Regions:
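Internal, well-ordered alpha/beta segment that forms a basic, Gly-enriched binding/recognition surface
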Residues: 1-5
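Sequence/fold signature of self-assembling virion shell proteins
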Residues: 6, 25-65, 94-211
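Short, glycine/acidic-rich hinge or "gate" loops at secondary-structure transitions
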Residues: 10-26
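A Trp-anchored, charged/polar loop motif used as the substrate-binding/catalytic surface
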Residues: 60-77
Length: 211
């Protein structure tokens, strides 16, 4: 079941297009979140596509300004300062952790941290980002399941999702089935049938790759 859950996570977070079972070797396949949000023509009606201002395209030097622009772009579509969630791959998460902590000088970079003298730990992670147009909870994406992208920063993809505008719909809930033992030992299988529902692609943001 754990492996099935990981397969589901990788499929939902993927960039693949949908496929319809045809009885001739093509299996049904849901459209991955990356394909829903890439703004490409033909995936969804033009009025509901993810705006270009909500996509940090490949090669973008990611900064706090760009993150704020993505959040503001989502706000312009929904009109609501929603609680958003950023599902970030490892490279993107580390870049965000350095927001407002590094400054460049002519000779060196200076890192600023808050340190409690009574504590033996220094916190460098960022779990919550508050902006003018929404509060973003930042969570780790499973590195085995996030889409493989190319950019200056390895593993730099992420999804800025609005929980009110997506869902997972199950046809067959996840479960296990035991098959009869015909003399070869115990056997069975686990299965699940579901699809990803993206109710408004414009209500989300997409970080494809960063440099």
């Amino acid at each position: 079941i754990r492996e099935l859950k990981r397969d589901i996570e990788a499929t939902i977070a993927g960039t693949q297009d949908l496929a319809v079972e045809n009885g001739a070797g093509v299996a049904s396949q849901l459209r991955g979140l990356g394909d829903w949000l890439d703004g490409a023509a033909g995936n969804v009606p033009a009025a509901f596509q993810t705006p270009a201002s909500s996509i940090a395209a490949t090669g973008t030097a990611f900064s706090e300004t760009i993150l704020n622009n993505l959040i503001s772009s989502v706000f312009r579509v929904t009109g609501s300062a929603s609680n958003l969630m950023l599902v970030a791959d490892t490279g993107l998460r580390r870049v965000i952790a350095d927001f407002a902590r590094t400054t460049s000088s002519a000779t060196d970079n200076v890192r600023t941290v808050n340190y409690d003298g009574d504590s033996g730990s220094i916190k460098l992670s960022v779990d919550l980002y508050e902006s003018d147009h929404g509060v973003v909870s930042i969570v780790n994406g499973n590195p085995d399941c996030m889409p493989a992208v190319t950019g200056g920063v390895a593993n730099g993809s992420g999804y800025l999702v609005n929980p009110e505008y997506y869902g997972v719909h199950e046809l067959i809930p996840m479960g296990s089935t035991r098959l009869p033992n015909l003399g070869g030992g115990e056997r069975g299988f686990v299965d699940c049938a579901l699809t990803l529902g993206v109710y408004h692609p414009g209500a989300h943001g997409y970080i494809q790759a960063i440099s």
